Amino acid sequence: MKARKLWSWSLALWVLACASVGAAPAAAEPFPVRGLCIAAPAPRQVERFAAWMTNELAARGVNTLIVRVDFNYAYESHPELRGGAPLSRAEVQRLVQAGRAAGIHLIPQINLLGHQSWQSTPGKLLQVYPEFDETPWVTLPAKYQWPNPDRLYCKSYCPLHPGVHKVVFALVDELCDAFEARAFHAGMDEVFYLGEDRCPRCGGKDKAELFAGEVTRIQQHLKSRQRELWIWGDRLLDGRTTGIGEWEASFNDTHRAIDLIPKDVVICDWHYERAHPTPIYFALKGFRVVACLWNRAEVGAQQVRDLMLMRERAAPAVRQRLLGVVQTVWSGVDGFWREWESLKNDPPPPPDQARVARCFLRVSEEWKVAEKSQSDEALPR
């Protein structure tokens, strides 16, 4: 029933998107964004990573690479926040040069607001600045399990702490300068701790307004430096109304922030279990959006086909906001490379193995089909 409601809701939005006077279906066009989101390489992997961008990713049509750096950079502004094996500025420059030569736009990421811990370990920011913790009374367990009485998934920093932005914005600026980046990805997914009652600064405040306030503050900071903000989109979807749930959408009322944040934020709309048709919702709200996938090849292929159809049928103003697709990788670089290389074996691994690399190969074939269809339609008859 929930699935039928979601499809009816999305179909109605889709029809609205297509309803322009005298509009005819547009010819298929290549996606403006054909991307991959992956962890930053370790210093020892930089040369291989640069060659991989040139020889493999560009050949597959990738033109956007979201690089999950977080604290794995040798920050000069806050050296106390360097990770264990940080990239140097020279190593980042090597990646930037390789990306530029391959026609790949690099977008660095630091998780802001949420994802400030993982299981039993605090993230670097809260290790060094525990006063930024939104929930200091929640102790990280020796052995993590979900569910748990504290509903602890990941810690958050308090968005109203007076000292937090001076620190994190220094990191953002330094990293963007090193990457010569036109855009920055702030994460902001799966934020479960926000506006907690016991927080002396934001307890009792509207969670949607808190989330929107943090998005807007980051966006305004980047805009003042001629950069744009990308974020994950799950906190902007109503998990109950849509039936999508509390992971790929929100159960803590942050979804209303969609009407409170600037429209020039780019939304990364991730769905991994099924191809929810939510990109059109974001596009109709005025946002540019990319559909994001993970480890189910058929789901990823369906997301590509759906987005192609949305772009083909939508009015021009909406079509230009449906930017494309991004394959996400949640292992380290080594893990993805192992999957990637295993698919070259004869015979290849069974279908239940190498699922992320298999999904990416399938999706990149799908967007090649889209480009071929567009080229064929352009031929004289």
Model regions: which residues?
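Catalytic-core regions of glycoside hydrolase
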Residues: 63, 178, 200-362
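Bacterial N-terminal signal peptides
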Residues: 8-20
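Carbohydrate-binding surfaces of carbohydrate-active enzymes
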Residues: 355-381
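Aromatic-lined carbohydrate-binding surfaces of glycoside hydrolases
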Residues: 35-251, 257-261, 265
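N-terminal secretory signal peptides that target proteins for export/translocation
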Residues: 1-5
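N-terminal hydrophobic targeting/anchoring segments and the immediately downstream early-domain regions
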Residues: 24-55, 59-60, 64, 135-138, ...
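Intrinsically disordered and other compositionally biased segments
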Residues: 6-9, 114
